[in-house]
């Protein structure tokens, strides 16, 4: 079987790295921000526009696709790339986190997590084995081990038990993946290449549990490592401190993926700490609620002060929204609850995030120290 997945570091600056992942569906330049396309769509913008924005990898969610349209349906249609007509890279999360953030009546046992669908109340069980079977059937290029995202706050004993469960599930995930990885729908047509399974580090807010989880996850051995259990309501300073201490424990020749992060200033901060991949619903969800990120900070477009503002959303942005429409028009669309508001706002926010990451990558390669960005201290006050 030829090389399924590779990662090279191309330049470093301090802890930061500029790199390149190669998956069965193409190359991904890192550091990378991955738009969330939960049910095989990045809400509000079509695939050709995502390509125009330069998206090289996006997320799908196993939890959602398992419930609708179902893994079997997607597998029969050749996998999620064919299904959503996306010929670049895709990553799927393994479902455990979504069960806890979306479904009712969850019960965790050694076997896995039983839950009821948030769509129709039907009962289901997710286990490491079923999560691998689902992610193989869906067919993303990078898939995640089935883990337990330890809730916040959690006592040390609870966090340790949760970490141990995740480590046992990581072993089971890897064993199930190795046994079935050739069953991915596009195995033959992509040169007998298979998916890459990433491990997930837990350990909550305890530095020594984070260290133990990182070391034991690396001992199991994966082509890439995610930091889970963050962006779960903990103080952002706590996240930064624990990420800074955990990253050096991960192999420098493999990608590091910080799940569920974050604000524009955060993705710059974490890229500087040596994180290579990030994802968050923030830019797309915030767009749908009229919260827009610009080079001058964030703004809520429905604010009265934009009613007759003929200027662009962001004078320093080269996206097609900022090149064509006025703030007055964008405010009008949002106030009128027009569907075009969702499309234009999402296009801009994603463009801003992707452009920010491109600038960080350039700064690492060119050796510049500055990536000029708004360092917004108290986001809630500045949302005008
Ligand atoms: N498998 C796995 N997946 C995860 C996904 C996560 N996503 C997050 N945080 C996202 C939090 C988040 C949710 C919504 C918004 C929009 C504004 O409200 C922003 C951030 N933390 C996460 C932790 C894990 C984890 O341990 N394991």
UniProtKB/Swiss-Prot annotation:
The encoding gene is: tgt
Q: Where does substrate bind?
A: 93-97, 147, 202, 229
- Catalytic class of the enzyme: transferase
Where along this sequence does the record place binding of Zn(2+)?
317, 319, 322, 348
InterPro entries registered for this protein in UniProt = ArchSynthase1/Queuine_TRR, TGT, TGT-like_sf, tRNA_ribo_trans-like
Q: Which GO terms describe its molecular function?
A: metal ion binding; tRNA-guanosine(34) queuine transglycosylase activity
Q: How is the cofactor bound?
A: Binds 1 zinc ion per subunit.
Task: Give cofactor(s), names only.
Answer: Zn(2+)
Q: What is its EC number?
A: 2.4.2.29
Family from the record: Belongs to the queuine tRNA-ribosyltransferase family.
Provide the function of this protein.
Answer: Catalyzes the base-exchange of a guanine (G) residue with the queuine precursor 7-aminomethyl-7-deazaguanine (PreQ1) at position 34 (anticodon wobble position) in tRNAs with GU(N) anticodons (tRNA-Asp, -Asn, -His and -Tyr). Catalysis occurs through a double-displacement mechanism. The nucleophile active site attacks the C1' of nucleotide 34 to detach the guanine base from the RNA, forming a covalent enzyme-RNA intermediate. The proton acceptor active site deprotonates the incoming PreQ1, allowing a nucleophilic attack on the C1' of the ribose to form the product.
What is the name listed in the Swiss-Prot or TrEMBL entry for this protein? Answer: Queuine tRNA-ribosyltransferase
């Amino acid at each position: 079987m030829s090389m399924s997945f590779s990662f090279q570091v191309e330049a470093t600056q301090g802890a930061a790295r500029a790199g390149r992942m190669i998956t069965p569906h193409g190359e991904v330049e890192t550091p990378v921000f991955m738009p969330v396309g939960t049910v095989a769509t990045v809400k509000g913008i079509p695939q050709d526009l995502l390509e125009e924005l330069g998206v090289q990898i996006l997320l799908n969610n196993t939890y959602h696709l398992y419930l609708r349209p179902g893994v079997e349906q997607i597998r029969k249609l050749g996998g999620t790339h064919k299904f959503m007509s996306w010929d670049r890279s895709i990553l799927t999360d393994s479902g455990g986190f979504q069960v806890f953030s979306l479904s009712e009546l969850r019960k965790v046992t050694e076997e896995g997590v039983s839950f009821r669908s948030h769509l129709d109340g039907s009962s289901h069980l997710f286990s490491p084995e079923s999560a691998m079977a689902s992610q193989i059937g869906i067919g993303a290029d990078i898939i995640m081990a089935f883990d337990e995202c330890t809730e916040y706050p959690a006592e040390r004993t609870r966090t340790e038990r949760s970490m141990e469960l995740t480590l046992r599930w990581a072993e089971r995930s890897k064993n199930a993946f190795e046994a079935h990885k050739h069953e991915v729908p596009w195995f033959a047509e992509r040169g007998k290449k298979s998916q890459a399974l990433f491990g997930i580090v837990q350990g909550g807010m305890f530095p020594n549990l984070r260290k133990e989880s990182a070391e034991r996850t690396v001992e199991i051995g994966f082509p890439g490592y995610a930091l889970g259990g963050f962006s779960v309501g903990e103080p952002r300073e706590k996240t930064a401190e624990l990420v800074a201490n955990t990253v050096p424990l991960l192999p420098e020749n493999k990608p590091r993926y910080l799940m569920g992060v974050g604000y524009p200033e955060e993705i710059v901060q974490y890229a500087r700490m040596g994180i290579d991949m990030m994802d968050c619903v923030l830019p797309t969800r915030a767009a749908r609620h009229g919260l827009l990120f610009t080079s001058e900070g964030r703004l809520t477009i429905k604010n009265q002060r934009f009613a007759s503002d003929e200027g662009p959303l962001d004078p320093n942005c080269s996206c097609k929204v900022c090149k064509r429409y006025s703030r007055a028009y964008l405010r009008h669309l949002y106030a009128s609850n027009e569907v075009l508001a969702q499309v234009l706002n999402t296009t801009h926010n994603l463009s801003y995030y992707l452009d920010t990451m491109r600038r960080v990558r350039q700064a690492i390669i060119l050796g510049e120290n500055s990536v000029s960005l708004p360092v917004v201290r108290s986001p809630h006050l500045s949302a005008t």
